[in-house]
Amino acid sequence: MAPSKTYRVKLAGRFWTWCYTRLRGSADGWQHDSKDTVLIHDKLPPQRRMEVDLHEALHCLYPDLSEESVTDGARDLRRLLWLLGYRR
């Protein structure tokens, strides 16, 4: 199935292909470092999508950060941005 939306973004000096597509399994997002690609499930509710976007962006920016730190940081940033009125 082709991605529903694809973007080219630059994070930490690298270009990434950011794709919204149907994902199988339980993960809402994947960051493929060797392919410079991020895949995000295309059917997520807005707040969850924002958090997954932030989560995967943090993986791209800080690859040595622990999964727990990435998860906590993404959740905290999503709460702040949502409170400030940022929406998709």
Regions found by a protein language model. Give the residues of each.
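Active-site scaffold of zinc-dependent metalloenzymes
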Residues: 2-47, 62-63, 67-81
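Active-site recognition of the HExxH zinc-binding catalytic motif
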Residues: 51-60
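Short, charged, intrinsically disordered terminal tails
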Residues: 84-88
